[in-house]
């Protein structure tokens, strides 16, 4: 005679061996190594398929129209897979690879249109990533869309003379996203995806920003693009970063109910002003300290780890640049 779990629990309870309600059926989870292998298999399958298509239809890479059509089709297929098979590891990774390939084909097609400038291509890419962010609910893909879409927008604005202020702009957007993580519970997952995408872009800018910035400035000079603010642009940008540091500390104090007239509030604002002054000479100090601060305030270990990594990486890079 077989006994179900509920009856067995009732018998044990009558004998005084257990107490309380019967435990729910355990949720069966796939081991992490199996999920990893399924994800890798999805990428391998997608790239084999794309390699076959690339060899058999080489004309796609040579025609702007064909590249745009095939790229858009791949993005559409990836969106369909994400929305219908969102829980499968193989399917989600396969769709992610298809989406990346589609995005690369779209960029390839846009670059082959001779009349289009870099800023126009970057704006189209930013709009594409915004659309994919809204259509695809996969968290990792959303982080990718937020990072690449923001990077494309930065590239477009840089070509219009806003290059010195881009780090401050990314920093402000990052701070706003994480300070409002819990403001809209229904959208908290999307806000976190935006926040992670922006912090990755911010860290990349901190690590390679100095070298890339000098190269970018030379390119803009040759292209005849004048920077807004002229010779004062770097100082204005550094002052903006310092102001954002003070603003973040002020918002966190308000959130915690600490008055500025109290001793802890005065100490926090004083420390923020000190970091802001240091940031005028080394903007990365203020940026990385805020990443650490927001990570600690929100209880986010990933942000804390990224903050520590970015602080150490920036200090190493800054020391190297002083040599």
Question: What is the role of each PLM region?
Answer:
Residues 1-323:
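Alpha-helical multi-pass membrane segments and their bilayer interfacial helix-loop junctions
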